[in-house]
Amino acid sequence: MLTVLVDYDSGNLHSAEKAFQRMATETGAGQVLVSDRPEDVARADRIVLPGDGAFPACRRALGSYGGLSEAIEEAVTRRARPFLGICIGMQMMATRGLEHEETPGFGWIAGEVVRIAPSDPHLKVPHMGWNDLTVDHPHPVLTGIETGDHAYFVHSYHFQVAHDAERLAHADYGADITAIVGRDTMVGTQFHPEKSQKTGLRLIANFLTWKP
């Protein structure tokens, strides 16, 4: 079994690589490889797409690696490889992003990425730090994760899904903030599982052993 963390120069993958390698060892889930090569994505059994920064910049960066975006599309939509998007990697699952400019996403989960607008003016944007999760819909990747568990967020925009059934969990930050999305063989987290201690490691382990 091979899990590929896609490296397209949009964030430091060191902590994510360590967390995935640790949980792959603990669960017997095989090898974890960080790669920017389309051929590695093509042979992967599972794909993880991280991303830090602004949606348009990450989308352009991914597109600048010849064949990489296409390899992800092929693996996820045509060959149904399990996929996990993290932070901007999750946002790119949307129809479009509205950060700075309108930018098309993969369009795998209907909805758009919009700026967080807390109802409480004392709540600062970006949403940064620990927050509680509220589980909206059960999912194998959420096994052992309950409402009230903590996750670590750093973001100014969030994914407004078109269909409630595809929002698996949310957080409260003066408004409902989408925390986890999912459909078919794909899931995404707005928070960073590799920085979310027990909750994040549980989610990573669940993803690595998920058999959709």
From Swiss-Prot:
Residues 2-212 form the Glutamine amidotransferase type-1 domain. Gene3D superfamilies: 3.40.50.880. It is found in: Cytoplasm. Its main location: cytoplasm. Pathway: Amino-acid biosynthesis; L-histidine biosynthesis; L-histidine from 5-phospho-alpha-D-ribose 1-diphosphate: step 5/9. It comes from the Bacteria. GO terms for cellular component: cytoplasm. This is Imidazole glycerol phosphate synthase subunit HisH. It comes from Cereibacter sphaeroides (strain ATCC 17023 / DSM 158 / JCM 6121 / CCUG 31486 / LMG 2827 / NBRC 12203 / NCIMB 8253 / ATH 2.4.1.). The gene is hisH.
